[in-house]
């Protein structure tokens, strides 16, 4: 049979179809020369890639790929063809094709990066990459050639073969250092992991740092610790901004609005997702300068923020994205709730951001009692906006006072109508979120009287104090940053392993705060003062499954309690030990931890009705140590979504149940 310029014939041996093609085809090598196709060489590569895998057929991959070969085909195209052929065979019945495709892709990736399968020595690689401007020069300034040789001995390049195909595609697309214009890739995954470790611990004493580098490298390269996109794609490069979450609060002035917009552009361009608190902006028709002009309302300024968010990609790694927050009692709320839907016109829609509606107990109470919610412009009701977050009793007092003041502009809406509109938009767009601001302040580690939480981040897992910027260089404002990572519960055998992993994660991320740059002074002020971290989990679904538990029947409740008690305890213990060594964070006194209040004290006690698991760890000793020595970090845990970074570990994302078998082909 003649296909694509070559003769093929087929035989059946033991029920399997074998494909044979003549070897008259010419192939074009990477250096531009041509030679006859060597099918035996291809077969050897496939044989190597299939080693140890179950239920994979090399002949099936050969059959699917050979029929796509043509005279003059490039060797790189041959490799991509067999990778695609293997990936197309991934199924529930034969899942190991994902590893066959991944190994072939790793082989191809290394040939592109190094011109050969075997990676170079680490020191030689770093010297070359620093010379090209791809790696930060500090690597060669901070470490000697002998130390690089030691680190080279830590590397196990065979760990590349543990990636799934989906993971390799994520590495190629997002995480490996590359020229994002030409697509040229400069490294493979084990260099990524060892150099992230080297960068983060570069400031540690010379006599101990290589021990931390090795331990951290082993933890991340065996998928026990999962790193977020900004760290994986950025640490080791000259662009030093690795916080995943940036929370920016806007005031009610043009200077503040413009400063907020400038801060958004700075951080979006450096890999960060954005949370914007725009709740202070006054409503449409409000007087400006005593009535000299009237206000154009929130929507034009939301459009301004949207333009800033979309003006840059996140360092070329992902598109700019933001969630914008406003209170449910804002006078314009009925116009704001519909901003994302597909009805309306361009002038009254701002569709390319997500939205967080801020609610407290009073709003729910009005709903349950069938009462009205009164809407105000924040500029017309002094003290109400701040009390909404800091003091719920004071908020209710002011709210009812302003409701009864006929001189204040207001609008009454049936609570059921307002909640119905919100839930309708939430259901139809999937991107309207809810922030219960009273709970964020009563269950946070911050004292709301000193450091209230007034917003969240892009994905709503972070709750940190902020202060409005009135100028992009305003050092009195506060931009909140959160630096993330996660424990892969599927990769650990027992909860006791979390103690060492917590030490590594806390120390690495805390060191990162000193290692990274801060394009806005208000961000550096907040990061250095609070030293906030957010360490969560991935593969929770697998953790439950391998322990024989389910989401749906309550069987997982006690295991979940044990798991997250261990996580919280070991994280706090690690931060406490670090505080003994390097000092507590400067603004530790603004946390409830300074008063000896711990998460075991503030959780909602109704949980005791459904979970009867006791506490297993020595919290009282930890409490006393924290009161004495403090914590290095104001926050330590966060349940981030980890939508793409979890794919590197071939894990389910965050705490979410799997929605179905998935693959990338």
Task: Locate predicted features.
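Extended catalytic cores of very large enzyme megasubunits
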Residues: 17-665
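Aromatic (phenylalanine/tyrosine) cluster motif
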Residues: 7-10
């Amino acid at each position: 049979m003649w296909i694509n310029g070559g003769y093929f014939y087929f035989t059946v041996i033991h029920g399997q179809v074998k494909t044979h093609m003549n070897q008259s085809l010419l192939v074009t090598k990477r250096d531009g020369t041509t030679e006859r196709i060597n099918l035996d060489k291809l077969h050897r590569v496939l044989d190597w890639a299939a080693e140890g895998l179950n239920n994979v057929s090399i002949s099936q991959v050969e059959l699917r790929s050979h029929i796509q070969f043509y005279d003059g085909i490039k060797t790189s195209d041959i490799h991509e063809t067999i990778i695609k052929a293997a990936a197309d065979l991934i199924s529930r019945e034969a899942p190991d094709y994902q590893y066959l495709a991944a190994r072939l892709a790793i082989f191809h990736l290394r040939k592109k990066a190094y011109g050969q399968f075997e990676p170079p020595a680490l020191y030689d690689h770093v010297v070359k990459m620093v010379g090209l401007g791809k790696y930060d020069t500090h690597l060669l300034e901070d470490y000697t050639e002998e130390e690089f040789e030691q680190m080279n001995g830590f590397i196990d390049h065979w760990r590349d073969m543990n990636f799934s195909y989906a993971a390799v595609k994520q590495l190629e697309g997002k995480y490996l250092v590359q020229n994002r214009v030409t697509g040229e890739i400069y490294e493979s995954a084990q260099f990524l992991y060892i150099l992230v470790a080297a960068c983060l611990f570069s400031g540690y004493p010379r006599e101990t740092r290589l021990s931390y580098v090795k331990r951290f490298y082993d933890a991340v390269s065996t998928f026990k610790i999962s790193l977020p996109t900004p760290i994986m794609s950025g640490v080791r490069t000259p662009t030093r901004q690795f916080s995943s979450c940036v929370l920016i609060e806007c005031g009610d002035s043009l200077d503040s609005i413009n400063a907020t917009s400038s801060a958004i552009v700075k951080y979006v361009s450096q890999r960060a997702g954005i949370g914007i608190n725009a709740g202070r902006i006054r409503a449409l028709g409000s007087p400006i300068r005593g009535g000299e002009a009237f206000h154009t309302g929130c929507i034009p300024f939301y459009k301004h923020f949207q333009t800033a968010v979309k003006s840059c990609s996140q360092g070329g790694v992902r598109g700019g994205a933001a969630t914008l927050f406003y209170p449910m009692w804002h006078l314009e709320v009925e116009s704001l709730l519909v901003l994302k839907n597909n009805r309306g016109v361009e002038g009254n829609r701002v569709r390319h951001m997500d939205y967080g509606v801020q609610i407290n107990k009073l709003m729910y109470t009005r709903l349950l009692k069938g009462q009205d919610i009164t809407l105000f412009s924040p500029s017309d009701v002094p003290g109400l906006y701040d009390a909404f977050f800091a003091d719920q009793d004071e908020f209710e007092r002011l709210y009812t006072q302003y409701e009864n003041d006929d001189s204040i502009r207001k609008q009454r809406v049936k609570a059921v109508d307002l909640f119905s509109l919100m839930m309708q938009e939430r259901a139809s767009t999937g991107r309207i979120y809810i922030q219960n601001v009273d709970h964020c302040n009563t269950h946070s580690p911050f004292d709301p009287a000193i450091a209230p939480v007034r917003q969240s981040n892009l994905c709503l897992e972070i709750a940190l104090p902020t202060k409005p910027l009135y100028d992009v260089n305003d050092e009195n404002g506060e931009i909140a940053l959160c630096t993330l990572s996660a424990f892969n519960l599927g990769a650990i055998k027992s909860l006791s392993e979390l103690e060492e992993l917590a030490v590594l994660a806390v120390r690495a991320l805390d060191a990162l705060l000193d290692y990274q740059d801060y394009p806005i002074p208000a961000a550096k002020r907040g990061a250095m003062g609070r030293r906030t971290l957010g360490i969560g989990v991935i593969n929770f679904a697998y953790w439950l499954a391998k322990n024989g538990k389910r989401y749906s029947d309550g069987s997982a409740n006690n295991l979940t309690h044990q798991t997250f008690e261990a996580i919280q305890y070991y994280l706090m213990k690690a931060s406490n030990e670090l505080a003994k060594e390097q000092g507590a964070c400067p603004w530790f006194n603004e946390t409830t931890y300074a008063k000896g209040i711990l998460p075991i004290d503030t959780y909602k006690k109704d949980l005791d009705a459904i979970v009867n698991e006791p506490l297993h760890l020595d919290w009282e000793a930890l409490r006393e140590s924290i009161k004495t020595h403090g914590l290095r970090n104001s926050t330590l845990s966060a349940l981030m979504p980890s939508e793409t970074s979890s794919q590197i570990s071939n894990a389910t994302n965050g705490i979410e149940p799997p929605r179905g078998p998935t693959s990338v082909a």
